[in-house]
Curated annotation (Swiss-Prot):
Substrate binds at Y153. This is Deoxycytidylate deaminase. Residues 1-171 form the CMP/dCMP-type deaminase domain. Binds 2 Zn(2+) ions per subunit. One of its GO terms (molecular function) is zinc ion binding. Pfam families: dCMP_cyt_deam_1. Zn(2+) 1 binds at C19, C49, H94, E102. Its cofactor is Zn(2+).
Amino acid sequence: MKASTVLQIAYLVSQESKCCSWKVGAVIEKNGRIISTGYNGSPAGGVNCCDYAAEQGWLLNKPKHAIIQGHKPECVSFGSTDRFVLAKEHRSAHSEWSSKNEIHAELNAILFAARNGSSIEGATMYVTLSPCPDCAKAIAQSGIKKLVYCETYDKNKPGWDDILRNAGIEVFNVPKKNLNKLNWENINEFCGE
């Protein structure tokens, strides 16, 4: 499969995330076949991010007309036409909660492959957002030999890519403008203000 196709599949996988901030998807491909996918979220049985954020009052109702005025796309829909986004002033509180309660897409994809007995030695990982340093270390240890990502995480510390390159992993960026099979109006990524 072409890198642009698999990366767009990663964006579709990201839509399963219940995170009210970033929806991230990862796909592990080997020999032209998808062997694992993952998205960011709470471990099975845990409280979903969007539910916790709603309980804490971190979400703002942004009707559809507000999106046209420059706000980010919908994040959470509670069975109505209302749309909710993470309020900017709660982003740091969300990050603290997320770091304790959510697993990143990259790690979920690696864990699901292991759980299913699929070798990822020599595989390629496609991810919608650049990995954090901890995920970069997990990728470096996993046997993956190539990482393809689309967007750069705005809070990422420099050096995540050095972790991968120092482990002999090729790192490639595919700009979003090269991904033309999806209707981007229907894909939610960052759900904050």
